[in-house]
């Protein structure tokens, strides 16, 4: 079953086999959003910095994950916020016994799947469309996160229609996708050179960039397949 859920700026699609798991995911989103909001009230700089950040050992788990991801990539902690909220929500479902759980937070997706699934990529006005990836079953939570310089409201300094990163660390995938998108220029060279910004980061499996009519790949990526993308079905803010 699938449910669309919004809490303030957080807009997600939650997929699970039982409604009770979906309710747990919604509770997790509310709890961790509140903890993040409280932390930002105590230090507003955390929300706006585009640079690595240090937090205390008693910071909330959501803050620690954001900081670790941003610091690994070399950018600000809020670069990982969507993926981190998604990962914590999926984690709450898995802890309760779910063997199949997906949270799509505006294109930053955390998932555990006990059957093959296809995740499509929306690349705006690019001529490269209706592509997706087949994700084989796994026994641990994974992430596929997408950032764009042409789609969506997030701060972005690049030209990517879609910069996609795969990692078992969902927060890291989100931060790295942001950095990859920021680094993407125009044309084949602009796409290929962008991968230099993330190629040395540990625990990133692979990445894909779509820019206009150009598409580049780096590392290990899942099998590419056709995915008929319907705009109205995309989780977006």
UniProtKB/Swiss-Prot annotation:
InterPro entries on file: ApbE-like_sf, MA1715-like, UPF0280
Protein name: UPF0280 protein Mbur_0309
Superkingdom in the source lineage: Archaea
Family: Belongs to the UPF0280 family.
Organism, scientific name: Methanococcoides burtonii (strain DSM 6242 / NBRC 107633 / OCM 468 / ACE-M)
Annotated disulfide bonds: none
HAMAP family per the UniProt record, alphabetical: UPF0280
């Amino acid at each position: 079953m699938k449910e669309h859920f919004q809490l303030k700026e957080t807009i997600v699609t939650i997929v699970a086999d039982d409604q009770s798991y979906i309710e747990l995911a919604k509770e997790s989103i509310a709890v961790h959003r509140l903890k993040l909001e409280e932390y930002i009230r105590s230090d507003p700089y955390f929300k706006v910095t585009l640079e690595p950040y240090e937090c205390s050992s008693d910071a909330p788990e959501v803050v620690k994950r954001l900081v670790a991801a941003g610091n690994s990539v070399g950018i600000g902690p809020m670069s990982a916020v969507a993926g981190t909220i998604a990962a914590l929500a999926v984690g709450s479902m898995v802890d309760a016994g779910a063997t199949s759980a997906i949270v799509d937070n505006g294109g930053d997706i955390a998932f555990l799947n006990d059957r093959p699934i296809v995740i499509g990529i929306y690349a705006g006005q690019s001529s490269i469309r209706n592509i997706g990836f087949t994700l084989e079953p796994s026994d641990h939570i994974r992430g596929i996160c997408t950032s764009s310089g042409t789609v969506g409201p997030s701060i972005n300094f690049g030209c990517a229609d879609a910069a996609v990163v795969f990692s078992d660390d969902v927060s890291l995938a989100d931060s790295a996708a942001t950095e990859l998108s920021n680094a993407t220029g125009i044309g084949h060279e602009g796409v290929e050179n962008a991968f230099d910004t993330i190629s040395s980061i540990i625990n990133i499996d692979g990445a894909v960039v779509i820019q206009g009519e150009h598409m580049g790949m780096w590392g290990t990526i899942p099998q590419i397949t056709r995915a008929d993308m319907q705009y109205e079905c995309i989780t977006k803010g």
